[in-house]
Regions:
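A short alpha-helical cap/connector motif
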Residues: 1-118, 122-147, 151-234
């Protein structure tokens, strides 16, 4: 994964899809593309559900369709009724608010468990946090949850601010502790987040969560040709 993040944008197939776009308008920050490629490439040409919160001008859904291949279902949600016109083969749009959990439940019931969730919606901290709380446990056990444009976590008009309680950045700081709860000597109980999350990744204005069941902790000691594996005592 690290090697892909370090590649130049020009070497990435998703970047090629973006710069050669001749369909609807796509608006993205250039530095997002290596992270997209690193976390999404394993889903290419596989049956999967991609849930995009915030449809923009419709071009990003088309880009994900081209990149992920013919077996992907791209589901976009937005509050703007005109986004419904973005529908085409493999792309479905549902109109509703990301803060409406009943609406989100209906979307999942219709299209199935999302393998990737990309939150590019309102960027308001209350929406980002509540959407994550609801959708993350409902994302595929081996899926990816990505929140972008997190610079808004530092902007007052989006409910943000440096070290302001309740922003998604501050929530993530607590989730780092949850990820490592089993090492806190019972100071912090392990949660479902602890057990269902393999890793958390932070980039400029972006947070990515890789889901998956973790293997039992094992300590590996190597001396010459001998390797000893033993379970760690927590």
């Amino acid at each position: 994964m690290t090697s892909c993040v370090n590649k130049s944008e020009d070497s990435l197939s998703l970047w090629s899809e973006f710069v050669n776009n001749k369909q609807r308008t796509i608006h993205k920050w250039k530095h997002y593309f290596p992270a997209y490629e690193a976390h999404f490439s394993r889903f290419v040409n596989r049956p999967m559900v991609f849930l995009e919160i915030g449809c923009g001008r419709g071009g990003s859904a088309q880009m994900w369709k081209r990149y992920l291949g013919p077996h992907a279902m791209i589901v976009g949600i937005d509050v703007k009724p005109e986004c419904k016109t973005f529908e085409e083969d493999q792309i479905k749009i549902r109109i509703g608010s990301q803060s409406d959990t009943s609406f989100l439940e209906d979307v999942i019931a219709e299209f199935g468990t999302p393998d990737i969730v990309l939150d590019d919606g309102s960027h308001r901290m209350s929406d980002v946090v509540e959407t994550f709380r609801f959708l993350y446990p409902r994302t595929s056990p081996n899926g990816v949850y990505l929140v972008e444009d997190l610079h808004t976590a530092y902007w007052d008009e989006f409910g943000g601010g440096l070290k302001r309680e309740g922003t998604f950045i501050e929530v993530c700081k607590g989730l780092i502790d949850e990820l490592n709860a089993e090492w806190t000597r019972d100071a912090l109980p392990a949660t479902e987040f602890t057990h269902s999350t393999l890793s958390m990744h932070f980039y400029d204005s972006m947070a990515v969560f890789e889901r998956g069941r973790r293997l039992p902790h094992s300590d590996v000691r190597i001396s010459g040709r001998a390797a000893i594996l033993k379970g760690l005592t927590r």
